């Protein structure tokens, strides 16, 4: 990988506090190919490349596994306040750093190689927001934000996440093409069943 990556303190925030209401609750504990969804997300992280990994969750199982792996376990006691609180908590735990990769737990087909491609794009263009793009042109997760955008991320409210910051700065976004199945997020049990057939 580009040596510039080693010179930048890039942190990762794993967002794992969602209630999964459309799933019927407990979404991140659901299994896919023998692993719980949150474990699959942890396993695609090239953790040796990050200055630190912060996992934001209100679930004891997820927090305990985070600590076991040497990650920072960040408790979100009020997930009902929306994803903005998780972003803020994760951002504070990740500092000091020059960029943060925000990763979600409900994309079970996301591959480590794709995460590496996003990090490599960030190393080559450290001033840009890096976002994966599907074949249909829609942007997905994970997204890499340089420190210049931390104040805007910290100011988010309610159920608004990093996509709001991306929409405010389209000129700053550099996209990395990824296959549709890697960006597909599992909102329902039916979604998970459909992914198992791919």
Locations of regions flagged by a protein language model:
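Conserved alpha/beta core of the MobA/IspD/sugar-nucleotide pyrophosphorylase nucleotidyltransferase superfamily
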Residues: 2-8, 151, 155-198
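Nucleotide and nucleotide-moiety/phosphate-recognizing core
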Residues: 5-139, 171-178
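Short beta-strand and adjoining strand-loop segment in the mid-core
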Residues: 88-90, 148-153
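Short glycine- and hydrophobic/aromatic-rich loop-to-beta-strand nucleating segment
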Residues: 141-145, 184-186
